[in-house]
C-alpha cells in the first residue's frame, strides 16, 4: 500500500537515514555568498556610468552645434543637459565611495559647469586639484568656469600653467576662449568693454606665440 506523501516526510524526519535514502533532505544547503565589491570598486563603476552619460551629453551638444533649426537645436541642448544631470548623480556617488578619486571630482565639476552651476563646479575642481595639483583636465575645466564668471585674470593664469605643462589642454582652453570672446563681442553684458578688449588682445598674442612653438607635452585624460 502506497504511503501518503505527508506520512513519508514524517517518517523520513523521525528515522535517521530514511530521508537520505528516499531523496528527502531535512536541511537546507547554505547559500553561496557573492563577493562584496570594495568602495573603490563601486566608485569606479559609478564613475564609468557617469562617463557614459557625459559622452552622450557631449554628442548631443555637438549635434546641436551643427543644427540650423532653432527648435531642434534647443531640443538637442536640453537632451545634453539632461545627460549631464544624470552624470552628476553618478559622479556624486563615485566621490562618496572614494573621496580620493581625482578624475571623478574633475568630471563632476565639468558636469556642473555644463549645466550652468559655475560656483559648485569650481568647488569640485578645487577638490580635484587639492588632491592632485597637476591634474591638467581640472585646470582646463576650471578655467572655462572662470570664463563663465568673467574671472579673466584667473583664466590667464590657468592658460599659462597649461601652456607650460600640457599643450593639448592649453589649445582646448584657447578654443573655449575664442567661443567666449565671440559671444561677448555680440553681447558684452556683465563685463567692462575695456577689459574685454584687453583680454581679446592678450588671447590673440598667445595664439600667435603658440603657433610659433612646437608642442611640449601631450596630456591624457584618465579613464577608469
What are these regions (language model features)?
Residues 107, 141, 175-176:
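Canonical tetratricopeptide repeat
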Residues 55-56, 114, 148-149, 183:
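Register position in tetratricopeptide repeats
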Residues 61, 76-93, 114-127, 149-158:
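Structural signature of tandem alpha-helical TPR/SEL1-like repeats
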Residues 28-34, 164-224:
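Terminal, low-structured helical/coil segments at or just beyond the last alpha-helical repeat
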Amino acid at each position: 500500500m502506497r504511503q501518503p506523501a505527508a506520512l513519508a516526510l514524517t517518517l523520513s524526519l523521525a528515522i535517521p537515514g530514511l530521508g537520505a535514502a528516499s531523496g528527502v533532505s531535512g536541511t537546507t544547503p547554505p547559500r553561496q555568498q557573492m563577493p562584496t565589491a570594495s568602495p573603490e570598486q563601486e566608485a569606479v563603476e559609478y564613475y564609468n556610468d557617469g562617463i557614459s552619460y557625459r559622452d552622450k551629453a557631449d554628442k548631443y551638444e555637438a549635434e546641436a552645434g551643427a543644427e540650423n533649426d532653432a527648435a531642434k537645436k534647443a531640443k538637442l541642448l536640453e537632451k545634453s543637459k539632461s545627460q549631464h544631470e544624470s552624470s552628476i548623480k553618478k559622479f556624486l556617488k563615485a566621490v562618496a565611495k572614494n573621496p580620493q578619486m581625482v578624475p571623478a571630482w574633475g568630471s563632476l565639476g565639468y558636469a556642473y559647469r555644463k549645466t550652468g552651476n559655475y560656483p559648485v563646479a569650481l568647488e569640485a575642481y578645487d577638490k580635484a586639484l587639492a588632491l592632485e595639483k597637476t591634474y591638467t583636465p581640472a585646470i582646463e575645466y576650471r578655467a572655462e568656469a572662470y570664463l563663465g564668471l568673467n574671472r579673466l585674470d584667473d583664466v590667464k593664469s590657468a592658460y599659462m600653467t597649461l601652456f607650460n605643462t600640457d599643450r593639448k589642454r592649453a589649445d582646448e582652453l584657447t578654443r573655449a576662449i575664442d567661443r567666449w570672446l565671440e559671444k561677448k563681442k555680440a553681447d558684452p553684458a556683465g563685463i567692462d568693454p575695456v577689459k574685454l578688449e584687453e583680454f581679446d588682445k592678450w588671447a590673440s598674442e598667445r595664439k600667435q606665440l603658440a603657433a610659433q612653438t612646437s608642442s611640449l607635452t601631450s596630456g591624457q585624460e584618465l579613464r577608469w
